[in-house]
């Protein structure tokens, strides 16, 4: 099983497991993102499950193209919990991973942040690009940082299978008059607004 550059990991000793993510081949991300490298499979789409005591890879979970560049991974803080979340950077999707009744591990997509159609940017669509995820200490909220869209999101994950967006704060990003980017279609917004120049 070839490695595509491990990025982050989280472990749960109670379940004798460590799970890691894979960003991509270093020769690709060191030069900057090239969509041809994505199409060629040079960026990761798996999370990797290890036996914690034996320090051995036991399972690879394929997240598919919607899971390109899985970066940050977080178990719930409860040490007996056998589930958590992983954020896939490029297409801004979050997957819930969990231990199945058979004892192996699985994952499914629970959050999908759509790209925005834009003018005045390098591409006709701008993905959110997830750069970090964080669990609240009480395991109730999951926080996401959307680098290009410029927002920080709070999801209620009391039901981890069905996260619910409960807060959003815009802190920057590329969708501002200063950058000259105009949103022409946003699947999440009903009303369009723009921040005035100051």
Description of each model-found segment:
Residues 21-42, 94-97:
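Short, conserved, GDST-rich strand-edge loop motifs in beta-rich repeat architectures
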Residues 1-13:
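Asp-box/WD-like beta-propeller blade repeats and closely related beta-sheet repeat scaffolds
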Residues 23, 78, 87-90, 99, ...:
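Short loop/turn segments immediately following the C-termini of beta-strands
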């Amino acid at each position: 099983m070839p490695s595509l550059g491990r990025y982050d990991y989280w472990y749960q000793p109670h379940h004798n497991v460590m799970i890691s993510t894979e960003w991509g081949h270093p020769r690709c991300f060191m030069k900057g993102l090239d969509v041809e490298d994505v199409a060629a499979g040079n960026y990761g789409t798996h999370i990797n499950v290890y036996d914690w005591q034996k320090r051995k890879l036991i399972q690879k979970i394929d997240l598919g193209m919607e899971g390109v560049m899985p970066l940050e991974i977080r178990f719930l803080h409860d040490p007996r919990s056998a589930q958590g979340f992983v954020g896939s950077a490029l297409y801004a999707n979050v997957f819930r991973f969990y231990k199945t009744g058979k004892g192996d591990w699985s994952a499914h997509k629970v959050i999908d942040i759509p790209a925005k159609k834009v003018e005045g940017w390098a591409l006709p669509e701008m993905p959110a690009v997830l750069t970090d995820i964080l669990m609240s200490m009480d395991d109730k909220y999951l926080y996401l940082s959307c680098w290009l869209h410029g927002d920080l999101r709070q999801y209620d994950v009391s039901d981890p299978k069905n996260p619910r967006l409960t807060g959003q704060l815009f802190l920057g990003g590329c969708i501002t008059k200063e950058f000259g980017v105009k949103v022409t279609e946003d699947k999440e917004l009903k009303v369009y607004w723009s921040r005035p120049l100051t």
